[in-house]
Amino acid sequence: MRYLDLNIKSILADWEIADAIRELIANAIDEHRLSNTAFPVIELQKGFLNSSLVIKDYGRGIKSNHFIQNESREKVQSEKTIGKFGIGLKDAIAVLFRHNVKVSFTSSEGTFTPVERMKEGMKDGTKTIQITVDETKKIDKGTDILISKISRSDYEKAIAIFLELRTGYQKLASSKKGDIYRSENGSEIFLNGMKIGTDENFLFSYDIKEPNKKLQKSLNRERKTLSRDSYRDNIISILKSSINKNT
C-alpha cells in the first residue's frame, strides 16, 4: 500500500461539511464537462442514524497526482469549470477529516482514502493527512466518491448552489454570454451553474458563461458571496445579447 502526503499547510477554518461536499460535487460536474461524459450521479443513501453520499462521475478517473497538485492547468484554462481541482480537493478532504467524516475515492488506479500518519523525515512526532492507495480495489471507468455519515441538511446545503441540481427555473433566453431564468427562488446569480450571489433588485436569475476579468478576480478560495459590483457588467452583457419578447 502506498501513501501520498497532501502537504496541506492550513485548513479553511470557516468551511463546514456542506462546503467540502460542494467542492467534490463541483469537481465531478467539471469532469463531466471536460470529458464530455454523462452527468454525475449524486445520491444520498439513507442509513439508520446518518446517511452516505455517493458522487459518481463517468470521466477519466482520479489519479495519484490529483492529490498532490496545487492547481489544474486544464481547469484554469477552461471557462466552463467551477471547481478548484487540486486546491479545492485538498481543502475538501481536510475539512471532512477535521469533522471526522470518512471519504474514499475509487477509480481505475485504485481506492484512495485519507488517514492521519507520521510525516516522513520528521522526528518531532508531526502527523499529517495522507492518502493511502489500495491498488486492489478498482473500477473500470470514472470516479466513485463515498462520503460516510453525513446529515440530510449538509447534503441539501451542498446541492443548493448548483443550478443543474435545482428545480423551479424556467429558461427565458440564452446566449454565449449566459442564460436568463425566471425562478421561484427569487433572483440568484450563477457562474457556470454555481451560485455566487443573490440580488433582490433583479427581476430574473442569471447564469454567467463568460466572466470578465473583474469577476474572475473577485472569485475567492472561500467561495464567499460576491457583491453586485463584481458581476454587474456581466449581467448587462447577457441582457444585451439576449433581448427577446421574454426579457
Curated annotation (Swiss-Prot):
Gene3D superfamilies reported in the protein's UniProt record: Histidine kinase-like ATPase, C-terminal domain
Instruction: Please name the Pfam families in this protein's record.
Output: HATPase_c_3
Domain of life of the source = Bacteria
Q: Enumerate the SUPFAM superfamilies for this protein.
A: ATPase domain of HSP90 chaperone/DNA topoisomerase II/histidine kinase
The entry assigns this protein to a family as follows: To M.pneumoniae MPN_635 N-terminal region.
Protein name per the record: Uncharacterized protein MPN_633
Organism, per UniProt?
Answer: Mycoplasma pneumoniae (strain ATCC 29342 / M129 / Subtype 1) (Mycoplasmoides pneumoniae)
Please spell out the taxonomic lineage of the organism that makes this protein.
Bacteria, Bacillati, Mycoplasmatota, Mycoplasmoidales, Mycoplasmoidaceae
